[in-house]
Amino acid sequence: MKASIRVKLETLVERYEEVQHLLGDPGVIGDQNKFRALSREYSQLEEVTQCFQAYEKVQEDLVAAQEMAQEDDAEMREMAQDEIKEAKEASERLTDELQVLLIPKDPNDERNCFLEIRAGAGGDEAGIFAGNLFRMYSRFAEKKGWRIEVMSSHASEQGGFKEMIAKVSGDGAYGILKFESGGHRVQRVPETESQGRVHTSACTIAVMAEIPEADLPEIKSSDLKIDTFRSSGAGGQHVNTTDSAIRITHLPTGTVVECQDERSQHKNKAKAMSVLAARIIQAEEARRAAVVSDTRRNLLGSGDRSDRIRTYNYPQSRVSDHRINLTIYRLNEVMEGDLAALIEPVVLEYQADQLAALAEQN
């Protein structure tokens, strides 16, 4: 193990012990925000600390086995060789695990997220495909034990959606789904196509981390324009006080969020504000991300909805991820929520890029 990496690990272990001590401090326990923040840091440090301690134990075992290999007794030497082999294999495995654990963590990865699906080019077929994608992600969430809740939706005339925003709640939801942001293209024969010709349509996906209330940006009420309208209508402001749908415009950025899925205007406003905050923060992070590596930008997307990341070809039962040149012929399984074969290779590529960057720093 490189000396620089060992120093980093020893520093993390020291911080782990410090946080462990702080969590028992009455002053910290009395401050719920500080206690939650330290608890989150403690859980993040615990895994790398335990892994490093296991690595150190293996190094001790290796030294002991190497000393035993110098014994006069042939049987002891043979036993020592077996232990040396096991220790070296364990050392290599733990070194790999530690390198992955040292990859800088995105603080948002463990959070819930908002999944936004918008129909793009392709007319009614794009709206139908948006509905297919929402069903696909709903099935995936179900397999992961996550909960998915519709925040806002605009149905299209022939089925599906013009736009759908859903909240996905569950451990690591954002960290897994963030790689889905970008353009999704479908190639298939629409049900309304009498000539049997393959049409190409598209949808765009945006995945935004849910921001905890304590971390929400300050949004001045003077920066907001709030309109109400009838949920069943196409929008527009009405005098009728029973109108429960909400449209919020953030004037400085021009960001617009609508929510009309709840009967309560208060609930719709609360939902819309949470999505608005996530969008504002995502836009700021996208600006900062302009300096990241090309690989990271390709995998996570630039924030531009036009970035095409995936094609779903129905005639060939093919799904292609254009970021890593991956093609699988399991379209039906994918549309039923079996996304692991698509997401995991992208995550591994992303980790490999970060490991390479870590190696350059050391």
Curated annotation (Swiss-Prot):
Pfam families: PCRF (PF03462), RF-1 (PF00472)
Entry's Gene Ontology molecular function annotations: translation release factor activity, codon specific
Post-translational modification: Methylated by PrmC. Methylation increases the termination efficiency of RF1.
Keywords from the UniProt entry: Cytoplasm, Methylation, Protein biosynthesis
Alphabetical list of InterPro entries matching this protein: PCRF, Pep_chain_release_fac_I, Pep_chain_release_fac_I_sf, Prokaryotic/Mito_RF, RF-1
N5-methylglutamine PTM positions: 237
Gene Ontology cellular component terms for the protein in this record: cytoplasm
Subcellular location field: Cytoplasm
Keyword DNA damage: no
Domain of life the protein comes from: Bacteria
Family the UniProt entry places it in: Belongs to the prokaryotic/mitochondrial release factor family.
NCBIfam families, per database record: prfA, PRK00591.1
Functional note: Peptide chain release factor 1 directs the termination of translation in response to the peptide chain termination codons UAG and UAA.
PANTHER family attached to this UniProt entry: LD18447P (PTHR43804:SF7)
Protein name per the record: Peptide chain release factor 1
Organism: Aliivibrio salmonicida (strain LFI1238) (Vibrio salmonicida (strain LFI1238))
Name of the gene: prfA
